[in-house]
Amino acid sequence: MRTILLSIICMMALGTCQAQDQKAERMKYIRKCYAEAKKKIDANGKNGKSPKDMRLIINRLEDEDIPLYDTEQLDFFFDEKFVDGLATKQPPYFIIENWGNHGHIRYNEVLLDPKDHQVIFCYMRGETDAGFVVESRYYYDAKGQCIEQKHNTHNSWTTPETEKENAEFYMNLFSKLNYNGYFTPLDLDKPKKPTTPKAERLKHIRALYAQAKEKSAANDKEEMSNDLHITIHDLGDDQPPRTTEKRIYFDKDGIYFISCTSKSMQSNGYSEYLFEPKTKDLIFSYTRGAEEGQVYEWRYYFDENGDCIETKTNHTDETDGGFYDKRAAKDFQAIFEMLNGHEK
């Protein structure tokens, strides 16, 4: 009996030692990945290579009567690989969030495993307007289980689960931003609404367009604006750098106007999306592209059912009645709702 008991104790001790060794190896691996990721970020866009990053900034005035101003910035750093001859963005290897509201600030880091893009480390630093600081670090194993957590205070604001959920939300957001125009299906079977005569509808759209341009321009000058900015630097290292900027303007009812600009040494692009204030349906889209001295333009006007009633273009060989623009607009709205729901 004594021999059996000693054997059990020895086996338990051996198992504990093995678990400790595995944890130590995992912690060593995470710290190595963290150092390599930071080194890549420092070198991003340097030494003759194109930068590869995405920055999202959302500014919100939460209440016009009580000026609580919410601003959030997300930075994604990623690699590109050639898949079937096309440069394809990989999931980010590192994510940084900066958030502030009325003197309260929060800073987050998320490290992804370069092998399988799973979350392996999260860091959070928060500070109240009174100067109280909270810091938390979470380390995860290959199965996504937290194996170590470190805090500077017992009053932690987060848990291993909440930080991992946040990280996975950021990953989902990154994926949707990359596949804009392809992930939100259109409702093609919804009941038809009564429509206004074409001339009256076009007059209505042009009036709303002028109002939206004026409103968005005024917003740009506001100290406390309501807008979402997305800036993307990408393209392979053997191509000229490209910068894509998307500006989404919204009010308490939702998005009312979007403008997108894409610039590189090879080509330039610009597009606009206008939404009906009451229904938030897309009612007008504009696209302009310039490449090798050629300029292409498309304008689509939509009725109350989302059907194109007028197309103006100088490139009649390539027109889709605004189908892609409608999908892209739906995706922008879905991304905006994701961000609003996540903050709430």
Language-model-detected regions and their locations in the chain:
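Surface-exposed acidic loop/strand-edge motifs in secreted or periplasmic proteins
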Residues: 44-107, 111-112, 213-270, 274
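Sec-dependent N-terminal signal peptides
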Residues: 3-15
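Aromatic-rich beta-strand edge motifs centered on tyrosine
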Residues: 109-114, 135-142, 247-249, 273-277, ...
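Acidic, glycine-rich flexible loop segments
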Residues: 122-136, 285-289, 293-296
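Short loop/beta submotifs within extracellular cysteine-rich repeat domains
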Residues: 104, 117-120, 145-148, 256, ...
